Amino acid sequence: MPIKVIKNLPAITKLAQENIFVMDTERAENQQIRPLNILLINLMPTKEITETQILRALSNSPLQVNLTLLHTASRKSKNTDEQYLETFYRTFEEVEDEFFDGMIITGAPVELMPFEEVDYWPELVEIMNWGEEHVYSTFYICWGAQAGLYHHFGINKCIMDEKLFGVYEHDIYNDRPVLLRGFDEKFWMPHSRHTTVSLQQIKENRDLELLAGSEPTGAAIVRSLDNKHIFVFGHAEYDWDTLNREYERDIKKGMDIAVPENYFPNDDPKQRPIVRWRSVSTLLFTNWLNYYVYQETPYIIEQIQKMKFERDKNLGAYI
């Protein structure tokens, strides 16, 4: 949360350099505050588990959040009861006339398929296009991040030689990215995927910034320069036992799966996993909500559409 101080206090400049948000008294007295409206596009088959993980991550912020759950209407869920979806979820058709301060698009177990062959791809494309005028900032996770990067910036995914499976240490490439405020210089985050994206294409795109990654994971966190798109290729939201459940599931299927890296003490699946990413999850989601949504989204939420028009108009002046 911002700290309110007297205008022109000398400490303001120093604190701002450290990504500590300071608000002068004049701005604070005129600031309009309302709950944040966040839309969660839950593409995972285990919807209850995923929604719980996301809710837990969002709940660490002192900001009030109104969360709307959405499932794709173009695919019938095989793992979640239809009555559950009708009770707690909405469809795109039901929300397309509304506006949201933020949107979260989860991962999905379809990464080995070309995007266009995923049965709900046309609907997801429609949602992402709609989000340009109806959502202030979007947070993409794992396959969702790959899908968003492909749709908005034309960077496709590629299959890795071996599945990236475990908890990995990452470097921060930008000196002071506000999204990573409070992170240690190196941090840990789970990954569970067969595909990756090109670091070179990300670095060559002048509308993107690579914030964090490592040699084994490649890109881990990327943002668009206008802060409208945040791409996280790992799973900061994972529970302590999520990788273990995935490992046991694949073992039962008879799959040739390696023990998750940097997860079990001494790589022994009989021992309780080591949690290294809990603070990362809290900081990542809280920073996104605070700096990329709360501090920037208009109080009159419908003005998001006008802001998109103004951005496009300004962009056209430089082309």
Language-model regions: role of each:
Residues 2-28, 44-45, 236-319:
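Acyltransferase
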Residues 31-38, 99:
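A short, charged/proline- and glycine-enriched loop
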Residues 33, 53-65:
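A short, Lys/Arg-enriched amphipathic alpha-helix followed by its capping loop at the start of a domain
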Residues 43, 151-242, 313-315:
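Pocket-forming structural segment of enzyme catalytic cores
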Residues 64-76:
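A short beta-strand-loop structural module common to alpha/beta enzyme folds
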Residues 80-98:
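Glycine-rich, highly charged phosphate/nucleotide-binding loops
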Residues 105-174:
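Cysteine-nucleophile active-site neighborhood
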